[in-house]
Amino acid sequence: MGMTRRNFLKSSSAAVAAAGVAGYAGAADSAKAKDEVIARTKFIDIHAHCTEDPLPPCNIAGVQPLPLPDELISWYDKFGVEKGVVLSLCNPENFVGGMATETILRICEQHSDRLIPSVGIDPRCLGNHVVNNKFGYIFKWYRDKGCKVCGEVCANLHFLDPKMQNLFKGCEEAGLPLTFHVAANEGWRYGIIDEPGLPELEICLQRFPKLRFFGHSQSFWCEIGTYKTWDERKGYPSGKIDVEGRIPQLMRKYPNLYCDISAGSGNRALLRDLDYAGKFLTEFQDRVMFGIDICAPFEKYISRQHETLRKLFKEGYISETVFRKVARENQIRELGLA
């Protein structure tokens, strides 16, 4: 029997409907598969802080700075973080009393399944000057005690200050990576000083090719794109990234520059332009690392990198491979955690 127009339309509609159902099923399967990847991928936090005892209220936000170890771990349980690197805050620009490496080692020994120690040395200690580098053996000593990173380096000195150069040299000799915080300018709270465009950092990347620099802070992440004002340099530039900045340029040129996406600075650098974030993370997938930087035990002060990375993966901006590398695999490789 010949095909009538009515039968043709009916069969065509059925075919279209079937294709649509198959398409929705495929999308659902894909979404379910991504949810399963997210559920089984535990983050490793490259940038954490905590303290044994409560510290005086911070004069910036007026709140208690730094969580206690159990508070930090409770946030990890909530966010799906397996473990984190506890960074020292030994520079006097940070907090009253600082944070000795011995304290970090003690905390991490008590929570060895969740917390990883770092070493913090102020570049101004030990009579350090241009011809007297005493840091190499110290970093090696702490390395052998289990410290995996040097930092967070927040001294308000220029990258090219001789004291800072000796610190970099000693860290490189010990084979430890270094987490640094860039300041907007001299006297602006804390952080290493550099000019817009990070010219001093570039010289250090050249001078210390075996030292892995883990970059962080507002004045670092603002360089993912371009900006015009000092307020943007010390804050959080917003909007689409139409012209790339110095960070991607430096990363293409120097394989020893890495990115730590912690704090509001790293998270907002990704959220301001999801399309560019996907391209950036994909291009530099082996040198970008998840971090949170919980600096106060209150939820409203905690950035949401875990949500951002999951969003980028679920919505197709990054692949599963990129997601897993940034979430944990790069940290495992660079810190020798396997």
Segments predicted by a language model, with ranges:
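Histidine-centered catalytic micro-motifs
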Residues: F43-D53, T179-A183
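A general structural detector for well-ordered alpha-helical segments in enzyme core domains, enriched
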Residues: L68-W75, A100-I107, K134-W141, K163, ...
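Short aromatic-enriched loop/helix-cap "lid" or pocket-rim segments at secondary-structure transitions
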Residues: L55-C58, G97-G98, V130, M164, ...
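Active-site neighborhood of phospho(di)ester-bond hydrolases with catalytic His/Asp-centered motifs
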Residues: I44-I46, V86-S88, S118-G120, G151, ...
